[in-house]
Curated annotation (Swiss-Prot):
Enzyme class: translocase
Name listed for the protein in its UniProt record: NADH-quinone oxidoreductase subunit C/D
Region of interest (NADH dehydrogenase I subunit D), ranges: 206-591
NCBIfam families xref list: NuoC_fam, NuoD, PRK06075.1, PRK11742.1
Taxonomic path: Bacteria, Pseudomonadati, Pseudomonadota, Gammaproteobacteria, Moraxellales
E.C. number: 7.1.1.-
Gene Ontology molecular functions: NAD binding; NADH dehydrogenase (ubiquinone) activity; NADH:ubiquinone reductase (non-electrogenic) activity; quinone binding
InterPro entries assigned to the protein according to its UniProt record, in alphabetical order: NADH_DH_suC, NADH_DH_suCD, NADH_Q_OxRdtase_suD, NADH_quin_OxRdtase_su_C/D-like, NADH_UbQ_OxRdtase_30kDa_su, NADH_UbQ_OxRdtase_49kDa_CS, NDH1_su_D/H, NiFe-Hase_large
Organism: Psychrobacter arcticus (strain DSM 17307 / VKM B-2377 / 273-4)
Record bears the keyword Membrane: yes
Length: 591
């Protein structure tokens, strides 16, 4: 075993158990990299990759979930001293719930030989992640069952997350769309069953191929679902994503650490400041910033407000998709009351871009307690009414109980997190399992279901709102005094009043707000329990004013990939309720 220290002093910390287990099996065959996030990170040879992954998957306390899989173009990276030589690096982020720990496996590739074996036989959810890596980097996964583009159309040229690929529209030749090109692009949308291994007919029947979307109210966004039908029964289905792709990870490479914050709001556009939290926390870890208790508490309170607004919309549209048209309008009244508080605190509603590196944009306004207290007094009885009037309705139960059902083992294999995982009976909530932002100081419960069906997923979301109300009340009652931003040279923006003292502070302020701060070189992942499941930002800094690589892992991407395994053999109406029950936001999926 070779150890490489990156940016931090490992101090004499005990060697993680997984590293010891790997050492016993693969002594001398891997390199350990110490990263800022302290996730055990191991470089292995391509020839050993599948063997190592399978070993980790079959340990006594196994790494059952492939949490993330992506790549980094290393060719322009300056600060990677001591790391294995690599033009492109593929990384696998694995998670063990029994150990409550993660491990990161890396494989170095040369530009002349961008091939790596597929992991789809070990984790089924590797399928989409590997397709995305091929789409964005051009890395080939040998043995993949269907290695095609996934976020970009099939006629796209190039691989956008390579460093030579332009990041701004002004760097490209002018775009034009004539009739011939439009027809060509439309023709490329034609679904060809044979390309997906589907048959057009069975022994005694012809199958129907039905498009749902990309513009359909039940799709909950720009999303296309192709169904192979035998009457009303779904024989197979192909989720087609990418219509909402905006290149968020590429944008992060051209924005300063501070100016990228508004882009995070638009990943899950219903999550508000919840989107900002994992990004901000990763940057703060890189910079070594410890935020004050008041800033922590404010962040928790506002994050839980957005959890409530998200879940209200989810429950309302869930009931609507089952045929109940009225509750969603009542829930918009509740959301408006929540947004009144959010707007009073942040100045904005859905996309406040309010968290800052080191704290928040400003302090809480005068009278904030009254607004929060009024909402806390209003909301519980409304939830009781929705449960009694709509969610206990026998028609809704008939449409959702036992529908789109899966168990804990299946959920973990597909990378399902959040309410979708807890509805199977597993009480895994990152706020409890790995507390961050002081969540260990709050008294709240983790709602779980038992059947893993559409109905349980909805009821878990309802109970989540009750727990969020408990957390918000504790924030209000125990709000610390003190500053709302850290006193740190890399906090952005820096204190303006100090610019009046001397020329040095004036220069530092000017550089920080114009060019942006220079973050130390290193790598850091932060995961949070977001509105739809686990959301993470894996940031690579090359000691510059902007990120070298920003990987955004979102829950919706994983949840949609699971769809065929859940609904094949069910009815079309069950497919609609599955989509309604997993809290889909396509911007969260496509990034």
């Amino acid at each position: 075993m070779v150890t490489v220290v990156e940016n931090i002093d490992p101090k004499i910390k005990p060697v993680p158990a997984v590293i010891k287990e790997l050492e016993e099996k693969y002594a001398g065959k891997f390199v350990v990299q110490h990263t800022v996030d302290e996730i055990p990170t191991v470089w292995v040879a391509r020839a050993d990759l599948l063997d190592v992954l399978l070993f980790l998957r079959k340990l006594p306390k196994p790494y059952v979930m492939l949490f993330d899989l992506s790549a980094i173009d290393e060719r322009l990276r300056q600060h990677r001293q001591g790391l294995p030589e690599s033009d492109f690096t593929v990384f696998y982020h694995l998670m063990s719930l029994e150990r409550n720990s993660d491990v990161r496996i890396k494989v170095a590739l040369s530009e002349e030989d961008l091939n790596v074996p597929s992991a789809t036989q070990i984790w089924p959810n590797a399928n989409w992640y590997e397709r995305e890596v091929w789409d964005m980097f051009g890395i080939v996964f040998t043995g993949h069952p269907h290695l095609t583009r996934i976020l970009l159309p099939k006629y796209w040229e190039g691989h956008p997350l390579r460093k030579e690929y332009h990041a701004r529209a002004t760097e490209f030749t002018p775009y034009f769309l004539n009739t011939a090109k439009q027809q060509y692009e439309q023709e490329n949308l034609r679904f060809v069953p044979e390309e997906w291994g589907m048959k057009r007919s069975g022994r005694d029947e012809d199958f129907m191929f039905l498009n749902i979307g990309p513009n359909h109210p039940s799709a909950h966004g720009a999303f296309r679902l192709v169904l192979q039908l035998d009457g009303e029964e779904v024989v197979d289905c192909i989720p087609d994503i990418g219509y909402h792709h905006r290149g968020a990870e590429k944008m992060a490479e051209r924005q300063t650490w501070h100016s990228f914050i508004p882009y995070t709001d638009r990943i899950d556009y219903l999550g508000g400041v919840m989107n900002e939290l994992p990004y901000i926390m990763s940057v703060e870890k890189l910079a070594g910033i410890t935020i004050p208790p008041r800033a922590e508490t404010i962040r928790v309170m506002m994050s839980e407000f957005f959890r409530i607004t998200n879940n209200l919309l989810f429950v309302g549209t869930f009931i609507q998709d089952a045929g109940g048209m009225t509750p969603v309008f009542y829930m918009f009244t509740d959301r408006q009351k929540a947004y009144d508080v959010i707007e009073a605190v942040t100045g904005y509603r859905m996309h406040p871009a309010w968290f800052r590196i080191g704290g928040t944009a400003h302090d809480l306004p005068r009278g904030w307690q009254r607004l929060v207290r009024e909402f806390l007094d209003w909301m519980p009885k409304r939830l009781d009414e929705y449960v009694k009037a709509a969610l206990q309705n026998s028609v809704l139960k008939g449409r959702t109980q036992g529908v789109a059902q899966y168990n804990t083992k299946q959920a973990l294999a597909w990378g399902v997190t959040g309410a979708g995982l807890r509805a199977t009976g597993l009480d895994f909530d990152l706020r409890k399992a790995r507390p961050y932002m002081g969540y260990e100081n709050y008294d709240f419960e983790v709602p779980v279901g038992y059947n893993g069906d559409a109905y349980d997923r909805c009821m878990v979301k309802v109970e989540e709102m009750r727990q969020s109300l408990r957390i918000i009340r504790q924030c209000m009652d125990n709000m610390p005094q003190g500053p709302y931003k850290a006193d740190h040279p890399l906090a952005v923006p820096p204190p303006k009043d100090r610019t009046l003292n001397d020329i040095e502070t004036l220069i530092n302020h000017f550089i920080s707000v114009s060019w942006g701060p220079v973050m130390p070189a290193g790598e850091c992942t932060t995961i949070v329990e977001a509105t739809k499941g686990l959301n993470s930002y894996y940031i690579t800094s090359d000691k510059a004013t902007m990120s070298y690589r920003t990987r955004i892992r979102t829950p919706t991407f994983a949840h949609l990939q699971q769809m065929p395994s859940v609904i094949n053999g069910s009815l079309v109406s069950d497919a609609i309720m599955y989509l309604a029950s997993i809290d889909v936001v396509m911007a969260d999926c496509d990034r």
